[in-house]
Amino acid sequence: MKAVRVHAFDAPPVIEEVTQPVLRPGRTLVRMEAATVGHIDRTVWRGSFLKHPPFPYTPGVEAAGVVVASAVYASGQRVWLRGSGLGTLFDGTWCELIDAPDEALGLLPDGVPAAIGAAFFSPSTSAWVALHDVARLSAAESVLVTGATGAVGSLAVQLALDAGADVTALVADAAQAARMPSGAKVLVLGNEPGSSMDSISADLLVDTVGGGVLAAALARVKPGGRAVLVGYTAGNTLTLDIAHFLQRDVSLLPLNMFRREPAGRAAAPDLLARLADGRLKLDVQPFALESAAQAMDWISQRGHRGRAVLTMGR
């Protein structure tokens, strides 16, 4: 079967023929239909993750497909896959057939396309857990979301609106502003992030980008408010004036989805139902399995919309 293989940190991913897996106890054989290319895959590939599979390895933490053989799932059932060491401890999902740990699978409703099933878990559960488990969002609170056209940011905007919050979405330009859902206030980020946000005051900040944008957005959180830190694509450092920070009394709340994955899995069926009936929308950008390197490059570019997904041709 075909699989994407990585032979060294930062080495270009290549397509190779590898031996097909066989069914083992505690595992399910799944024919892949779509596999996500995410920032965690890049982190492992660059050698910046805490662990990595032995070289050469097949990347891929998330995917969707159809069960071929299992002691737990019926043959032909549609499933999504995520975590349990996939792509971080052993070979992952960028392949045609995988033997995945049974606990990594969840049922995928018929109304959800495979590409969405592969891509939904990380951004939708991150947004849900950030708002409801970490921040404890209440209806009618004001919420500022940075990186609002990214996968997590866009879903945070949608879920906060659905919860009855007053939402302001921070975007990079007018073209991105036009893509925001109705009901959200939209603020275009200028060359000076701080001055762009002068008119904003929020009970809760959901920051998906980090860096200078986070520093500027923190100043717009009301005293006693909260800031959930989700991502760092714009920079992984934050400098604080401690005296000023103590006076403002804003709680900095990190989102660690490895620790909170049980909460994400509990929310997954409801989130999939919302994606199936259109209450939630998630953009995906398809790439062929052979184009994994291009997909890795695409997600590294600022301003990309949605998630990259490798699709397996029949």
Identify the role of each PLM range.
Residues 1, 263-314:
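C-terminal hydrophobic helical "lid"/dimerization subdomain
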Residues 21-37, 48-86:
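Glycine-rich beta-strand-centered segment in the early N-terminal region that forms part
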Residues 81-147:
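NAD(P)H dinucleotide-binding glycine-rich loop of Rossmann-like/cofactor-binding domains
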Residues 118-191:
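Mid-domain Rossmann-like dinucleotide-binding core that forms the NAD(H)/NADP(H) cofactor-binding site
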Residues 147-148, 209, 232:
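NAD(P)H cofactor-binding loop motif with strongest signal on the N-terminal glycine-rich segment
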Residues 163, 212-279, 312-314:
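Glycine-rich phosphate-binding loop and adjacent beta-alpha segment
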